A protein has these predicted regions:
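Short, hydrophobic/aliphatic alpha-helical segments
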Residues: 1-14, 153
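Conserved phosphate/anionic-ligand binding catalytic regions in large, soluble enzymes, centered on
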Residues: 14-29
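A structural-propensity feature for long, helix-poor, extended segments
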Residues: 44-45, 50-91
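C-terminal edge-of-domain segments
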Residues: 78-110
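C-terminal binding/interaction regions
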Residues: 97-100, 104-149
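Short cysteine-rich clusters marking metal-coordination/redox-active sites
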Residues: 150-154, 171-174
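Short Cys/His-rich "knuckle" micro-motifs
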Residues: 159-164, 181-182
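Cysteine-rich micro-motifs
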Residues: 165-177
């Protein structure tokens, strides 16, 4: 099977349906792979770890294709959001220090939301996106926080979400409950 077809099917399966928004992210990710000359694993994924970082400027369907193809996720700390509600993606390669920002061009007049899927599917990535100057610095690597067990509920949370009261760790939910009763 053709790698692009396999990637599309994987994106659609992950996302749950096919739509214009997913197509935008799919084409954006393919364009980033092409422009940055990135190597894909057999699965099609580019970034098995944190070497690639994507800053998405929207929280739309398009981001699911970024997750699948570029391997950028919030949990790994290499997918971040700078919300401008634009279909724009800034991608950094930690190994090469290269970065790129691509922005979706305006839809031609007459293309509706309903027929946008066919429109975006029919275009090559270079026809859909402008490459613009990168507007930000490479984000720092994710800071993995120490975990603590809440002395009240027994659940574990990272140090950013724990408060110490009388020397005992409390998760934010238990802290809020305790403050309500006091």
């Amino acid at each position: 099977m053709d790698i692009k077809k396999m990637l599309w099917e994987t994106c659609a399966e992950f996302h749950g349906h096919e739509c214009g928004g997913l197509t935008i992210g799919y084409k954006a990710a393919l364009y980033v792979v092409e422009l940055m000359k990135l190597q894909q694993e057999a699965t099609g994924c580019v970034s098995a770890d944190e070497e690639l970082v994507c800053v998405a400027e929207n929280e739309s369907c398009s981001v699911d294709a970024i997750r699948v193809i570029l391997g950028c996720t919030e949990d790994k700390g290499n997918l971040m959001f700078h919300l401008t509600n634009q279909q724009a993606f800034t991608v950094f390669n930690r190994k090469t220090r290269e970065s790129i920002r691509i922005v979706l061009k305006a839809r031609p007049e007459g293309i509706t939301r309903e027929n946008s899927f066919a429109y975006y599917q029919s275009k090559e990535p270079a026809e859909l996106f402008d490459v613009t100057p990168v507007k930000m610095d490479l984000p720092e690597r994710i800071n993995l926080n120490e975990s603590f067990t809440c002395s009240c509920c027994g659940e574990t949370a990272g140090s950013n979400w724990i408060r110490f009261v009388d020397g005992k760790p409390l998760c934010l939910d238990c802290l809020a409950e305790q403050e309500e009763t006091n």
